[in-house]
Amino acid sequence: MKIYVDADACPVKDVIIFEATKAEIPVTLVTSFSHYSNAEQPKGVETIYVDSGADAADYRIMQLAQKEDLIVTQDYGLASLALAKGCIVLHHKGYKYTNENIDQLLQTRYLSAMVRKSGKRTKGPKPFTAEDKEKFRALFKSMIPL
């Protein structure tokens, strides 16, 4: 198993890195050049930089990921592609994407886009909380081999 993180706006990178390095599972953070950092990462953690174009990180993750790898993303499109490839896919708020819930998530995203396109406003996501982080930590730990 390898772990791939859609890292541009991921608020749980610290949790992923801590738990994965403890379990000696390699982590690849995929992020755009606009988030470039000189910060050193622990052994087993790699950062891949991609262009800032739309979906560049998603395409790179899909090139790298193999069946049964774990992917962390908030992007429903990437989650859908990764599920089709046989990957385990988690959202940073602590829920697992599944073949049973992805269609509804994609439909909701589409309907919200149509409402915005018509000039109306839609609610954004709720703020990320400490409770969300702990929910993610528990789910993440249950998904990785010890």
Curated annotation (Swiss-Prot):
Entries under Pfam families matching the protein: DUF188 (PF02639)
UniProt-listed InterPro entries: UPF0178
PANTHER family attached to this UniProt entry: UPF0178 PROTEIN YAII
Family, per entry: Belongs to the UPF0178 family.
Name of the protein in question: UPF0178 protein BT9727_2823
The organism of origin for this protein: Bacillus thuringiensis subsp. konkukian (strain 97-27)
